[in-house]
Regions:
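Short beta-edge/loop segments at beta->alpha junctions of small alpha/beta modules
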Residues: 1-73
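Structural motif detector for alpha-helix initiation sites
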Residues: 19, 78, 147-148
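Hydrophobic/aromatic-lined pockets within catalytic cores
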Residues: 27, 86, 156-160
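Short coil/loop linkers at secondary-structure junctions
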Residues: 28-30, 88, 196
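A general structural signal for short secondary-structure junctions and capping/turn motifs
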Residues: 35, 105-107, 141-143
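Short gly/ser-rich loop at a beta-strand->alpha-helix junction or flexible surface loop bordering the NTP-binding
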Residues: 38, 45-53, 63-122
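Internal catalytic-core helix/loop-beta-alpha segment
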Residues: 112-138
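Hydrophobic alpha-helical interaction segments
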Residues: 130-211
């Protein structure tokens, strides 16, 4: 039988872990052990086959780190990324990501995780962000869209934002739009999307901010 203390020592540095990672250290690890530890509050289930230790939940970036791990490949984008950068005013409770896998929705103690599907040719425009592990001795990486990609992902995946009035409902930060938006990167990314409808939405958005 796998002992919890040794199990925690091996798996804790991963931040969160899958049952397959657990079995790479402990081939005899059974689901009964995971169920028992979950009931005792020693580990917390994130989705089927994925778990974390409770002390990790206090880390600032942990919810976003989990997003990149429990459904991969994916990167944090859309409303969550825009909120992270301070581009939209409201706090976002749902963690929104983009993936090449099928659209999915998960819920756990950290909140709700939403994944929107894009084709592989549109899976780019993100960067790695480091999260220091609990003991400070190592770091784990999660993936975050650049501001311009998060904005384009939103306009591409949410057809609701199709008129100037609807685009204004996003309440994008004016300082970001007029002073910090990387216009060169935005145009480069827009060309890579190669989508006439998206071009039209971006044109309307830039008009609102007189860009």
């Amino acid at each position: 039988m796998v002992g919890y203390t040794e199990f925690r020592e091996k798996l804790h540095p991963f931040g969160c872990f899958s049952i397959y990672q657990g079995r790479s250290f402990f081939p005899e690890l059974g689901r009964n052990s995971l169920v028992r530890w979950t009931k005792r509050g020693l580990i917390i289930r994130l989705r089927q086959g994925w778990y974390a230790f409770p002390d990790m939940f206090s880390k600032t970036d942990f919810s976003r780190f989990v997003a990149s791990r429990i459904y991969a490949p994916s990167y944090v984008s859309l409303h969550t990324a825009l909120s992270f950068y301070g581009i939209i005013p409201e706090a976002v409770t749902q963690i929104t990501s983009v993936t090449t896998l099928k659209t999915a929705l998960f819920e756990n103690a950290l909140g709700q995780y939403s994944y929107k599907t894009v084709k592989s040719r549109l899976f780019w425009g993100y960067k790695p962000v480091e999260m220091t592990s609990a003991d400070g001795s190592a770091s784990q990486t999660w993936f975050l869209a650049h501001p311009e990609k998060a904005l384009l992902d939103l306009l591409y995946l949410y057809p609701f934002y199709n008129s100037e009035d609807e685009l204004m409902q996003l309440r994008l930060d004016e300082v970001f739009m007029t002073e910090e938006l990387n216009r060169e990167r935005l145009q480069e990314y827009l060309l890579r999307f190669n989508n006439k409808v998206l071009n039209g939405r971006v044109k309307k958005l830039l008009k609102i901010y007189e860009l």
